[in-house]
Amino acid sequence: MNSHFVSAHTPFYINTKEGRYLVLKAVKVCDVRTVECEGSKASCVLKVDKPSSPTCERRPSSPSRCERMNNPGKQVPFMRTDMLQNMFAANRDNVTSRLLN
């Protein structure tokens, strides 16, 4: 089986039951077979335990999107670092080279 790995467009958010996650780097995997499995019929089921970190459990929930939009004066500052700046520059260069080719 031949697999192809392609860099996905980043950054982006993923909304889950546990909260909202910012994805800074992602890899898109192509031509990989998906196996359907039902837990009740499977002979082996992967169990994932949630971390028991007290800082995660005590963290206050973030305000809803409506609350954020009602307070336009309170914008969250963007932390500028060389790592993020280089990542965005590389992404911009990749998009530019794709458009020109």
Curated annotation (Swiss-Prot):
Region of interest (Disordered), ranges: 50-73
Keywords linked to the UniProt accession: DNA-binding, Host-virus interaction, Inhibition of host innate immune response by virus, Late protein, Phosphoprotein, Viral immunoevasion, Virion
GO BP, one annotated term: viral protein processing
Compartment(s) of residence: Virion
Role: Plays an essential role in virion assembly and morphogenesis. Also plays a role in the inhibition of host immune response by dysregulating mTOR. Sequesters host RICTOR and RPTOR, thereby disrupting mTORC1 and mTORC2 crosstalk. In turn, blocks the host antiviral response in part through mTOR-dependent degradation of cGAS, the primary poxvirus sensor.
Entry annotated with the keyword Lyase: no
Self-association and partners: Self-associates to form high molecular-weight forms. Interacts with protein OPG157. Interacts with host RICTOR and RPTOR; these interactions disrupt the mTORC1 and mTORC2 crosstalk.
Entries under Pfam families matching the protein: Pox_F17
Organism the protein comes from: Monkeypox virus
GO terms of molecular function: DNA binding
Record field: compositional bias (Basic and acidic residues): 56-68
Any single GO CC term annotated in Swiss-Prot or TrEMBL for this entry: virion component
Main location: virion
Name the record gives this protein: Phosphoprotein OPG062
Family the UniProt entry places it in: Belongs to the orthopoxvirus OPG062 family.
